Curated annotation (Swiss-Prot):
Keywords: 4Fe-4S, Iron, Iron-sulfur, Isoprene biosynthesis, Metal-binding, Oxidoreductase. This is 4-hydroxy-3-methylbut-2-enyl diphosphate reductase. Its cofactor is [4Fe-4S] cluster. Belongs to the IspH family. The gene is ispH. Binds 1 [4Fe-4S] cluster per subunit. It comes from Bordetella bronchiseptica (strain ATCC BAA-588 / NCTC 13252 / RB50) (Alcaligenes bronchisepticus).
Length: 326
């Protein structure tokens, strides 16, 4: 049991709105759970279904087996692709090995994949703005065989060398800092005036909304706690947004990670959560902050999200068939 020393005496807790799960994460988790209900364990999941330790451990306890590469799954097994998406090479490998696939790629990531295919088919080279090594970036870069470049900073743009400067397009990772992505996109357009931009921003609605909510939250607080795992891109961006507003901010996996010293003398403590962090963790953090002396909790005004994505047709069809037999 955690100690209840008082370090945040009489502080107010402010909750960002919106926060936590997005439609793509809800859908991805639902796909794994439904696959387990239909087929039983084990269900193999390539990479973490979403970047949250609590979610991954919960699904592991239900029978999901998380693997790094497809050759770790037996031939013919059921495999779920994570919400971050996969390359064409991974899809080809799954087909060659006879794996039965449920694709949990976020539809907003799939939108970027379609843009890449369309632009490459038109003969354009593509610059992707994103973080090297992130699964989403690897999946998007793997939608084409060559003709793609990755940049992360304005400095990367200055150093970029492309084959055909007059025939370029760009796309972005969906979970970037809105402000950082805008700066890099601006640098691309300044250096390559004819570069084709996405018809609609590739940064997803949930990333945008959660960053906007923190921009409203941070000026009201002297500390912001962001609930999310360290490998979550969008959660890290929320911490950065708060820090850029001049507020101390920490990224935490849950209530157990709170250092009471952080709360010493704080009068207003903001709490938000990345798009892959469940609300149960937020409420545990609120309870812990109350134990440490906070006396009130208030939710900031903000957007009420109503976005929902359907399950893959193959999975929803099997669910319907099963339910019709009951």
């Amino acid at each position: 049991m955690m100690t209840a020393e008082v370090t945040a005496a009489d502080a107010e807790v402010l909750l960002a709105q919106p926060r936590g799960f997005c439609a793509g994460v809800d859908r991805a988790i639902d796909i794994v759970e439904r696959a387990l209900e239909l087929h039983g364990a084990p269900i193999y999941v390539r990479h973490e279904i979403v970047h949250n330790r609590y979610v991954v451990e919960d699904l592991r306890g239900k029978g999901a087996v998380f693997i790094d590469e497809l050759d770790q799954a037996p031939a013919g097994a059921i495999v779920v692709f994570s919400a971050h998406g996969v390359s064409q090479a991974v899809r080809g490998e799954a087909e060659a090995r006879g794996l039965r696939v449920f694709d949990a790629t976020c539809p907003l990531v799939t939108k970027v994949h379609i843009e890449v295919a369309r632009m490459r088919a038109a003969g354009r080279e593509i610059v992707m703005i994103g973080h090297k090594g992130h699964p989403e970036v690897e999946g998007t870069l793997g939608q084409a065989q060559g003709g793609m470049y990755l940049v992360e900073t304005v400095e990367d743009v200055a150093a970029l060398r492309v084959s055909d400067p007059g025939n370029l397009a760009y796309v972005t990772q969906t979970t970037l800092s809105v402000d950082d992505a805008a700066a890099v996109a601006g640098a691309l357009k300044a250096r390559f005036p004819g570069i084709v931009e996405p018809k609609k921003s590739d940064i997803c609605y949930a990333t945008q909304n959660r960053q906007d909510a923190v921009k409203l939250l941070a000026p009201e607080c002297d500390l912001v706690l962001v609930v999310g795992s360290t490998n979550s891109s969008n959660s890290n961006r929320l911490r950065e947004v708060a820090e850029r507003k001049g507020v101390a901010a920490y990224l935490i996996d849950g209530a157990h990670a709170i250092d009471p010293a952080w709360l010493q003398g704080r009068r207003s403590i903001g709490i938000t959560a990345g798009a892959s962090a469940p609300e149960v963790l937020v409420q545990q953090v609120v309870e812990r902050v109350r134990e440490l002396g906070a006396v009130s909790v208030r939710t900031m005004p903000g957007l009420e999200e109503s976005v929902a994505f359907p399950l893959p047709k193959g999975l929803s069809r099997k669910i319907a068939q099963t339910e019709s037999l009951e």
